[in-house]
Amino acid sequence: MADSESKIYHERQRLQFCLLHCLNNLFQDKDAFTKESLNSIAEKLETNDPNKETWTPLSFVLKPHHNTITGNYDVNVMITALEGKGKSVVWHDKRIGASSIDLDDADTLMGIVLNVPVKRYGGLWRSRHWVVVRKINGVWYNLDSDLVVPQLFRDDDEVRGFLDQNLSLDVIGLIWNLPYNANQLPLASNYRVVITHWSDLNGMFSHVTNYPLDFDVYPQVSSKVSAIYKATGTKRFNANTRPVTPGKQSSVKGPYYKNPGCTTSCGLRLPRKTECTAARLIKDLSCKFVMGLRLVVMRKKKKKRSPPLKKASSSGISQPSVISVVNDNNHRSAAIEDCIQFINSSSSFTRSNSTCGSKS
C-alpha cells in the first residue's frame, strides 16, 4: 500500500493556486495545467464577457476570474479547463446526499471536486478551498493540497460519509470522462442540476418533459458560462440556489451567513464587484480618514479642558478634594466678611444722616 501511495501524484498548496493543484491532482499529471494556461483561460473569459465591468485601479490585480498574483481562480476557469480536456462537470444536489453517486462507475465518473470552507490563523480567516477526490487503482483518495500526503479511504461507505459530512456547506461537482448523456441522468424528484457541456439543448430533455423535475441547463459557450458564474473567487455557486447572474444577487444566505454572490476566495476575502470601484474606494478611505481626524481633535480638546493634575502629598496620597474644599471655604468666608462690612458701612451712613438731620 505504501508503494502504491508513493506513485500517486500529489501537489501541495501554494498561495491561492488550490484550483491548479486540484486539477493536476485530478489528472495525476504535473503538466496537465500550469499557471500560464489557467491565466490564459481566465483572460479569454474576460475578453468574451459581454458584461464587462468598468476599469478600476484594482483591475491590474483583481481580475474578474482570477488574481494575477496569487491565483484565486473561480469556477468558470475550472469548467472551461475541464471542457478543454473533454470532461464535463455536473453539480450535485446536496438534498439527495452522496448515496445517489455511483462510485463504482469508473468508466464515466473521473473524480469529485468539492469547494469546502476552511479556517486559518486560529479561525480569524475564513475562506474557501478546492478539494478533489479520485479513485486510483481501485482505491479512493482525498487529494487535498492542504494534506501532507493523500488520504486513503478504506471503502465506498467512508467516501460517502466524507461527502455527506461536507454536503451541508460544500459545492460538489462530479467530473465525467465523457459528455454527459441525457439517458444517464439520475431521475429524482426536485432534482436541480447544472450542465455546462452540451451546445444542443432543444431536444436534450424531450423524453423527460412529462417528468416532474426541475432542471437548469446551460450551454457550452464560454461567454454564457462566464455570465452564469459571474463572480470573483473560488466559490460562486451555492447548492441551495441558482448560479449568481450579473446584476442579480440571490437573497439566500450561503455558508457563514454570507450571500452566495459575495466574493469569498480560497484564501482571501475580496470586496464585491459592486464595491470594487475607484469612486467607492476613495469615498470609503476619505470617510475613515475624517473619522480618525475627528477622533484626534476630540481627544486634544478633552486634554485642554481637563484641569492639571494635583501633586501628591509627602505621604504619597493626593488630596485634591481637601484642597478644593479649603479654597471654597476661604472664598466663602471672604465674601461673607465683605457683605458684613458693607452692611455695617451702610448702617453707619444712615445713622450719621439721621443725627445730622436732628441737629439741624
Swiss-Prot record:
Q: Which residues form the Josephin domain?
A: 5-192
Record SMART domains: Josephin
Lineage, top-rank taxon, reads Eukaryota
> Which keywords describe this protein according to UniProt?
Hydrolase, Nucleotide-binding, Protease, Ubl conjugation pathway
What enzyme class is recorded for this protein? Answer: hydrolase
Active-site residues per Swiss-Prot or TrEMBL entry: 18, 129
Which reaction(s) does the protein catalyse, per the Swiss-Prot or TrEMBL entry?
Thiol-dependent hydrolysis of ester, thioester, amide, peptide and isopeptide bonds formed by the C-terminal Gly of ubiquitin (a 76-residue protein attached to proteins as an intracellular targeting signal)
Enzyme Commission number(s): 3.4.19.12
Q: Mind listing the GO molecular function terms for this protein?
A: cysteine-type deubiquitinase activity; nucleotide binding
Q: Which GO terms describe its biological process?
A: protein deubiquitination; proteolysis
List the residue ranges forming a coiled coil, or say none.
none
> What function does the entry list?
May act as a deubiquitinating enzyme.
PANTHER family membership: JOSEPHIN 1, 2 (PTHR13291), JOSEPHIN-LIKE PROTEIN (PTHR13291:SF0)
Q: What is this protein called?
A: Josephin-like protein
| Organism placement in taxonomy | Eukaryota, Viridiplantae, Streptophyta, Embryophyta, Tracheophyta
